[in-house]
């Protein structure tokens, strides 16, 4: 009973837009998107996990595979990435983790429908 007053950590709840299913994403890209939604800051829509951290969480062994899924999400306009720099104690600059920004689902849908219209125009 000594610990009964301690509160349990609240689970992180988030929703995944239903529209994700029509965008033609691979299962791995959906998993990476899901993870990024899980770790993002809910106010800024940003997060900084490394490829290694994402891979470990999703049991993907290769950093290259994680990078492929991240590129797929960028190509579908679901996320935006930008490089970061870390300054070490000795003043040297090193590459940091990517900064991921989750884009509004509407951006991805507009991109998807635009591509569909272009494909249909080529067929006609």
Region spans (language model):
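Winged-helix/helix-turn-helix nucleic-acid-interaction surface
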Residues: 63-124
């Amino acid at each position: 009973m000594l610990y009964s007053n301690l509160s349990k950590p609240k689970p992180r709840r988030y929703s995944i837009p239903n529209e994700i299913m029509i965008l033609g994403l691979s299962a791995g890209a959906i998993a990476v998107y899901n993870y990024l939604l899980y770790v993002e800051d809910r106010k800024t829509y940003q997060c900084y996990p490394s490829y290694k951290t994402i891979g470990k969480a999703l049991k993907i062994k290769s950093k290259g595979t994680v990078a492929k899924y991240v590129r797929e999400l960028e190509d579908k306009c679901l996320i935006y990435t930008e490089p970061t720099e870390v300054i070490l104690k000795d003043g040297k600059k090193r590459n940091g983790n990517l900064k991921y920004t989750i884009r509004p689902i509407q951006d991805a849908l507009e991109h998807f429908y635009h591509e569909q219209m272009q494909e249909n125009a080529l067929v006609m």
